[in-house]
Regions:
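Short cysteine clusters
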Residues: 81-84
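Mobile cap/lid helix-loop segments that border enzyme active or cofactor-binding sites
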Residues: 1-62
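Iron-sulfur (Fe-S) cluster-binding segments and ferredoxin-like electron-carrier domains
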Residues: 44, 86-104
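Immediate flanking context of iron-sulfur cluster ligation sites
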Residues: 61-78, 154-155
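Preference for long, well-ordered alpha-helical segments
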Residues: 150-162
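Short Fe-S-cluster ligation motifs
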Residues: 107-132
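Helix N-cap / loop-to-helix initiation motif
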Residues: 64, 98, 149-150
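Amphipathic alpha-helical interface segments
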Residues: 125-128, 140-148, 152-153
């Protein structure tokens, strides 16, 4: 449940209506995060740009959506955000994730057969970032560099905070 009310489609704010129009056009829908942020549409606009670049593969064209979703879901789980876990689990399911796969992300993903070595490296990096332990685990970046380009590592890092 949001702490602020969601801005509705019938809002009097022309700026919020334009923001919603952009979301529908670029993302296919208006997320609850945007509905809350629409109280300040000018501040919300860059968030939409980030969401588009992070979630639409045809925009960045660099990192597979599956890897992005794994990273986003791991971060949600580590933060203990039930809403985020539910929302991002649905994203995973829409990409074909099995329930066991979703469960494995929160457990011992490193020994799971669900994930490739590259995916494990991305999930581990997200874990190190979220828990602020990346300096204690230099091997996490070394593993990433085995499988991903610098541009892909930037995307993994950015969606870890999504």
């Amino acid at each position: 449940m949001a702490l602020l009310p969601y801005v509705q489609d019938d809002t009097d704010s022309k700026a919020a209506q334009l923001l919603f129009e952009h979301c529908r056009s670029l993302l296919g829908r208006v997320s609850n995060a945007i509905r809350v942020a629409a109280h300040s549409p000018k501040v919300a606009q860059p968030l939409v740009g980030f969401m588009v670049s992070a979630l639409r593969t045809e925009v960045s064209g660099i990192l597979e959506m599956r890897v992005k979703a794994l990273v986003i879901l791991k971060t949600s789980m580590l933060n203990g955000c039930a809403y985020c876990i539910g929302h991002n689990s649905a994203l995973g399911r829409s990409l074909g994730f099995e329930e066991g796969e979703i469960d494995a992300i929160s457990q011992d993903f490193l020994s799971s057969d669900y994930f490739s070595p590259a995916e494990k490296a991305a999930i581990h990096w997200a874990e190190c970032l979220t828990e602020k332990t990346y300096r204690k685990h230099p091997e996490a970046m070394a593993q990433l560099k085995l499988y991903f380009s610098d541009a892909q590592i930037v995307e993994i890092t950015m969606v870890s905070g999504f």
